[in-house]
Amino acid sequence: AFLRFDYSGHGASSEVFTDGCVGDWAEDAQAAIEVLTQGKQILVGSSMGGWISMLMAQRLPDRLAGLVTIAAAPDFTEDGFWASFNEDTRRLLLQEGVVNIPSDYGDPYPITKRLIEDGRSHLVLRKPLSLPFPVRLLQGDEDVDVSVELANTLFSHIKGPDVQLRLLKGADHRFST
């Protein structure tokens, strides 16, 4: 059996994306694991879900048997969005509370001040990340959203007895090519 769900504000959920943040989505995941599953779980997280899975590994290590990430995007609010914003964009975000950034997947992404600020409370690459179970990091070499360099950084950062990085030739961010 497996459990799949959409974070609040994502996919088929009824909430609005701009109302959420990393902490909220981590709470969604933790509640789903604690309420809807029994025994040890293998988490599979793609992109932001990879980051959330790492937060679950820190919060619920005794409930996990393994972790698989696909194009994991840990700390993307800080190292991706905030780091790439110029001074004008940062000022606009702080004043208006939201900026819209272009997306290759449809409508622009509304990035909120709350998303950026809350993300800073959940960064996983700035402190030790010990994962005592098997970890498989899957990364496409044609991913333009999460670089192979970030996958290598994550691989080097994780401490554990069984951590592997698998680079897939020709795969994009969504592993659709």
What are these regions (language model features)?
Residues 62-111:
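Hydrolase active-site cap/lid region
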Residues 108-128, 133:
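Active-site nucleophile elbow and catalytic-triad environment of alpha/beta-hydrolase enzymes
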Residues 45-49, 53:
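Gly/Ala-rich beta-loop-alpha elbow adjacent to hydrolase catalytic centers
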Residues 131, 137-139, 143:
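Short beta-strand/loop motif that positions the catalytic acidic residue
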Residues 19-36:
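Alpha/beta-hydrolase active-site loop
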Residues 144-150:
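Conserved alpha/beta-hydrolase "acid-adjacent" motif
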Residues 1-12:
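Conserved alpha/beta-hydrolase
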Residues 171-177:
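Catalytic histidine-centered segment of alpha/beta-hydrolase-like enzymes
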